[in-house]
Amino acid sequence: MFVVTNRITVKKGYAKQMAPNFTKGGPIESLKGFEGIEVWQIDKDDYSEDMYVNSWWETEEDFKNWVNSDVFKQAHKNTGKSEDSPVIKSEIVKSNVLSSLNRR
């Protein structure tokens, strides 16, 4: 299992508003190796909060295929930085799951 976390710092109050954009489904659900997406909210300070957008993939190769796909390009076509954007910064963290215990 391969997990990619996009750690997005946003202006306070925007995480709940933005989160559904990542989990509304669509073509990503039919991609080989896609397992799911969750968005977590982490309070930072009085001015910002973090959203951890976690996507699960069977393999790193499946994730790379997503990033290089037309589906990815379409999903990210309007994500350019603008003056009024609530996004302060973002960072991608890639992880291999070594051990887990699940009860969902």
Curated annotation (Swiss-Prot):
Residues where heme binds: H76
GO cellular component entries: cytoplasm
Catalytic activity from the UniProt record: heme b + 5 AH2 + 4 O2 + 2 H(+) = delta-staphylobilin + Fe(2+) + formaldehyde + 5 A + 4 H2O; heme b + 5 AH2 + 4 O2 + 2 H(+) = beta-staphylobilin + Fe(2+) + formaldehyde + 5 A + 4 H2O
First-level EC class: oxidoreductase
One of the GO BP terms on file: heme catabolic process
Positions that bind Fe cation: N6
GO molecular function: heme binding; heme oxygenase (decyclizing) activity; iron ion binding
Gene3D superfamilies given in the database record: 3.30.70.100
Record keywords: Cytoplasm, Heme, Iron, Metal-binding, Monooxygenase, Oxidoreductase
Residue ranges constituting the ABM domain according to the UniProt record: 2-92
EC number: 1.14.99.48
Matching NCBIfam families: PRK13315.1 (NF009840)
PANTHER family reported for this sequence: HEME OXYGENASE (STAPHYLOBILIN-PRODUCING) 1, SIGNAL TRANSDUCTION PROTEIN TRAP
Name of the molecule in the record: Heme oxygenase (staphylobilin-producing)
Taxonomic lineage: Bacteria, Bacillati, Bacillota, Bacilli, Bacillales
